[in-house]
């Protein structure tokens, strides 16, 4: 029997980490590592499996000593923790495999790893598992040809994680997004033709989690849940029946594009199925900047009215906002502050523009000689830029810092909460 250790690197303090609120609610992390739980499902007979999430517990030397192979999955924001894990594996002579968005976008940074997985793994996972079984691991596994059918994805191994330590569970229904935002890395990794699981497959995964006894919040992690509206409507119709039969054990939230506001049927299906919140990439209230960034879907209707339409349906809107675009007007910080207040989006992720690897933005800035040599941190809230901005950098960073302080000043934050509750969310 071979021992396979799955290790999830630690997140720094970011918007998505929620580290400072965990002690208040008796939890240790927001979400379990879905990718590793899914990869683990391919390892069946002949393997002992263990998963260590460094966000809820320490990776001990004893864990590494136990392992025959160490498998990791990471995003770029986890890079510091990941490279520490790789170094420890090397020191102890343990083969370490690195996959996920970070190695996919920056494979050149993984010379210390035994093997890297670039891209989606479904197409070659059976070979990968057999190579581990036979101790003949290749240095690189990479997708060739078409992107994989999600019907190949197995049910995640929720039994490998300590469910009680997380605020929310998560599953994936689709990959890819039909839009073409210049700064986005999702369309580079997953493509612009959304691929989905079948309703039956997705509900079977829900059954697997339901059978663990978990009840509560549930994040559907799709980068654009409504990328294929026909498929998502069919799934939601089945999900409504499932929720009713089970007594509505899960409260869902997800990420979507703002054109959700123009589809009353979809809004009704989502709220009926038990969705209570949606994260939207709002980016900026400046229409010219949206067009320059390729975010044309945000310009076809009033952004503020679209947000209120979604809120009035019963979905709280949380949003992502960006400053640092080339075409930002001089008064962008005041525009953002006013828009966030009027739109009643208290839970706003405001960040500096970041040029992520292998994006249209990075390619353009490279051609213009504006990329800095430093690797992107993946954290757009640490007051650093990995490119030379049009605006004076000191002015940009200070304006961003003040914007952040303004929108999260208690008076402004709770004012937005009050506006949302009293004037936009429906009364029940």
Spans of features found by a protein language model:
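Structural recognition of alpha->loop->beta junctions
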Residues: 108-127, 269-277, 335-350
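Radical SAM enzyme core and accessory elements
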Residues: 2-6, 13, 45-51, 63, ...
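Acidic, low-complexity intrinsically disordered segments
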Residues: 2-214
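Mobile, glycine-enriched helix-loop/loop "lid" segments at the mouths of ligand-binding/catalytic clefts
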Residues: 143-148, 360-383
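Radical SAM [4Fe-4S] cluster-binding motif and immediate context
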Residues: 152-318, 325, 329-338, 366
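Conserved beta-strand positions
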Residues: 6, 72, 220-222, 280, ...
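Short, solvent-exposed turn/loop segments enriched in Gly/Ser/Thr/Pro and often Arg
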Residues: 55, 102, 223-227, 256-259, ...
